[in-house]
Amino acid sequence: MPTIVPFETLTELFINLAEKHKGKGKNQFYFKPTPNSDYQPIEWGQVSDDVYSLAAYLVDKGIEKGDRVGILSENRYEWAIVDLAIQLIGGINVSLYTTLPPSQSAYILQDSGVKVFFVSTGFQLKKAVEIFDDCPDVMEIIAFDEPKLEHLQEEEYVYMFEDILLEGGKVLEENRNKIKKLSQEVEPEDVCTLIYTSGTTGKPKGAMLTHKNIVSNVKAATQHIYWDHTDSLLSFLPLCHSFERTAGYYAMISSGVEIYYAESVDTVSKNMPEVRPTIMISVPRLFEKMYNLIVKSVEEGSDAKKAIFNWAVETGRKYSEGQRGLVTLQKKIADKLVFDKLKERTGGRVRLFVSGGAALPPEIDTFFQCAGMNILQGYGLTETSPVMAANKPGQEKVGAVGTVIPGVTVAIQSLQDAEILGKVSGEDYPTKLSTGEGEILCKGPNVMKGYWNNEKATKEMIDTDGWLHTGDVGKFDEGFLKITDRIKHMIVNAGGKNIYPGPIEDLLKTSKWIDQIVVVGEAQNFMAGIIVPDFEAVSKFAKDQGLKFENNEELIALDEVNDLYKKEIRSFSKELASHEKIRDFRLVPNEFTVETGEITPTLKVKRRVIADKYGHLIADIFSNDND
């Protein structure tokens, strides 16, 4: 639907929303004051008061248009009003992932020149205090929560959020004209945020996104997918991620959708039945975990339970393909016996699941479609603000990331000779264009201004014709965009064949025994896998077999466990081409995590880190290859 107010900048979005909802008691945000409390609403009157008080404080401290203000916080109400205050005065939001180590946080603050730094908890404040002396531009640190360690609060440059809101309220009148002047000076081409790409290699790069970049993407998204004031969203993907920022925040408030903040990523399953949202925006990892939990539950059940489940899935498949008549009645029975229980876990009201950030394995996409819980896949990059393509409700294509959104053009460029194999704009539909595989390029108002302080990287990303090179391999299939993998992930085996590990990994991750996997085999005669088992499932298997083990290391060393994985991989590899089949593997005792450095904050695998960390296992796999 169209947005509920006109706007060309995020500054105008806030001002016009505040004016529209003034005095009407419209709730916008919901949060939990304590873990055991109910969700509390915050209406637009309070949002407006808080934003103006905060803007007054920042202006009074000398923050001007174009100055950078940092946020290191989980998703919460305070994050939103700090951002809106930054946008109101023409500042630039620099948000950091809470999982970043101090050294990376310091680098981002130094590179961007952040002047005021907002942090959430005592834990994040401790990190900020630790790096303060290394960040000469930072004038003060403002904490949302009062820290338990009193000495942190005693630092002369540390202030409490409640205190500065009160102070801002006191100086609001004397700064109101300055705020108005700054807000009127904001132009669509002005940078509104620096989003530092976590990157699987090298130092983070700050993508400069303008008001026009994000506003164009918000408007295109609201044309492409319908939501309105009757909807509610449970927000849990990090707001420093461009996907959540654009789709789960700006697009939502621009359409009147109410936003509930999950207590944390770990409490999403608990919060869903409490909130009963109608929209869920996530990454494939959540859907993979939901799917594997369901499969695990079914396989541990009786033969009758398995038969009912398989019948329900087959019935759902027939119904999703358009079969009616008797199938309609069977679908109602399948819902009652199987699928309604699954829907209850999400609160029972979700009408839109939106997935982005990575490709969703087709098997998982198909399963949720059979359950009547369609997932709308989308595709984009931080550098494209982020959405380039998305599926529309009722027009989904399994295995595709959708059609190109309005205002954007996507092209496929040959990897061999750089020829454009085909291109589609959002305005070209209906189109049945199909192409071969190549690199995905993008052009449009959503393409970033460039990388902050990094002209070299900007020129490598955006060519002289204005095409942004995504580094992803994909193709058009009757107008729908399909993603294969990252170009840099391509493995060239000893026979010279090009193999993309992503689709192989996606297939194997649908096994209930496999939590994470990285395919290896560069310049080798076969493919192999470094596998993180699903420790809950395999522990139960070992105990049921009467096997003894004290920890994960002992568990993965058991012959019976390795035999189990050999059979499972052999079974799944039947679906793969000969040169793609996994011929060997090694189990590892620990999950790949952000904290241990194997994955990025956006849950992308750092293949080089894993290759280094488990190099001895990889060498062992291929040491006996005498083919």
Whereabouts are the PLM-identified features?
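Structural core segment of the AMP-binding/adenylate-forming
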Residues: 60, 88-167, 564, 570
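AMP-dependent adenylate-forming
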Residues: 14-42, 149, 589-591
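Conserved AMP-binding A3 loop
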Residues: 41-45, 192-218
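Conserved ATP-binding/catalytic segment of the ANL
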Residues: 428-493
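Conserved structural elements of the adenylate-forming
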Residues: 48-53, 188, 207-228, 340
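Conserved AMP-binding/adenylation subdomain of ANL enzymes
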Residues: 215-232, 239-339, 349, 374
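Conserved AMP-binding/adenylate-forming core of the ANL superfamily
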Residues: 29-84, 101-106, 160-164, 211
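Conserved pre-ATP/AMP-binding loop-to-beta segment of ANL
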Residues: 143, 159-162, 169-196, 203, ...
